[in-house]
A protein has these predicted regions:
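Alpha-helical cap/lid subdomain in secreted, periplasmic
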Residues: 1-148
Length: 148
């Protein structure tokens, strides 16, 4: 990406990285630094956008579906705080590296805490948001750009 000399770099990842459990947290943080530091050296404005939550229950996936074991695993990781740990780590790295944060994950968490069935907002019942929720990411990114 840096070879294209962008004015702005938007980074968003962590959903799949959390599959490495807590043992992968340091690797995840290092991967973030390996993106942020070269961008900073090139004076490229960088925004880290936290991703959406994973599913919190497996009921949206039909029993016997090939995705059922994943749905159960992801729900466990989400509810037990594993993904929260990854997002907390990302926020800390952003602060350390002075990278602007667009915290969409915090919005998803707040919706969940207010009683929204966030699993219903995932198109595959696992980890990919429905089209309408992509709009949330877009608007939050615009808000972040205009206010930083």
């Amino acid at each position: 990406v840096l070879a294209f000399n962008p004015d702005l770099l938007v980074v968003c990842f962590g959903l799949n990285d959390s599959n490495a459990e807590m043992e992968g947290l340091d690797t995840y943080k290092e991967a973030l630094r390996n993106i942020f530091q070269p961008a900073k050296q090139e004076k490229i404005e960088t925004i880290f956008m936290t991703p959406n939550m994973m599913n919190t229950d497996s009921s949206k996936v039909s029993p016997g579906d090939i995705l059922e074991p994943l749905a159960e695993l992801f729900a466990k990781r989400q509810k037990e705080g594993l993904f929260d740990a990854y997002m907390d780590a990302a926020r800390a790295v952003c602060q350390e590296e002075n990278v602007t944060l667009c915290d969409c994950y915090a919005i998803w968490k707040r919706m969940y805490e207010c009683g929204v069935d966030t699993t219903n907002l995932l198109s595959n019942g696992l980890n990919h948001p429905v089209r309408k929720m992509h709009e949330l990411f877009a608007w939050q990114l615009v808000h972040t750009i205009l206010n930083n």
